[in-house]
A protein has these predicted regions:
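Cytosolic, long alpha-helical scaffolding segments
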Residues: 1-228
Length: 228
């Protein structure tokens, strides 16, 4: 029988692998490279000097080859490990890794819903429409950058960054509210159409879900140093 500590480390390792794949998929689907995310340039500067990749990111293929296999392996291993664990606290810790894997899988699915609009409208000749979609890209990029910073920080700062990510969930709700207010203004001054307003609001909602799923997964996967 596998020891609990060994099972948790195995789950963490595979979950990190799943996160790394998700991270790369999200970054490329919103038009950024790993270098962009890890740089110290502002996303405003990056967006001003960067062109979209000519080819679309095939999210169906990437989900099947980079996400689904790992997701199913984590769920299978977790379920088998839980059979041998009677302690409720330990069982819950294993369950958390299941949920983290589920959140990362859902991230890719939700990304598929907004990918086409993000690429289309962030390059729109309508500067007001483009700005709203580039805000979505910037917000996602900032989140990925924050998570990358989390992974290289020492124990003391790690706790603070985790707390900031948790606060980020509340900030996401504020962004939704601000977006609604802003697009209503754009409609009132006829800078965007009603159809474009609906697209912005729907895509912002899905972008928020993606961010929440990433944060929830990261809280589990990268909290090793503050949970032991």
């Amino acid at each position: 029988m596998v020891k609990f500590s060994a099972a948790i480390e195995a789950l963490r390792k595979e979950s990190e692998h799943l996160y790394n794949n998700t991270y790369a998929i999200v970054a490329h689907a919103i038009g950024f490279s790993r270098k962009d995310i890890q740089s110290d340039k502002s996303f405003k500067e990056i967006l001003e000097n960067k062109k979209w990749f000519s080819k679309n990111v095939d999210l169906d293929y990437l989900y099947q080859t980079r996400i689904k296999v790992l997701f199913e392996a984590i769920i299978d291993f977790s379920t088998k490990a839980q059979v041998y664990v009677n302690d409720e606290t330990k069982n819950h810790k294993i369950f958390n890794f299941k949920m983290a894997a589920k959140n990362l899988a859902e991230t890719t699915k939700n990304l598929k819903i907004i990918q086409a609009n993000i690429k289309k409208y962030s390059s729109s000749s309508n500067e007001f429409l483009a700005l709203e979609y580039n805000k979505i890209r910037s917000n996602q990029g900032e989140l990925l950058r924050s998570i990358e910073e989390l992974r290289v920080e020492d124990r003391e700062k790690l706790y603070l960054i985790i707390k900031n990510l948790q606060k980020g969930k509340e900030i996401l709700k504020e962004i939704d509210t601000l977006t609604l207010s802003n697009v209503e203004h754009l409609i009132s001054v006829r800078k965007i159409t009603t159809a474009e307003e609906i697209s912005i609001l729907n895509d912002t909602t899905f972008a928020t879900k993606i961010a929440e799923e990433l944060i929830s997964a990261v809280e589990v996967i990268f909290s090793k140093d503050i949970s032991n």
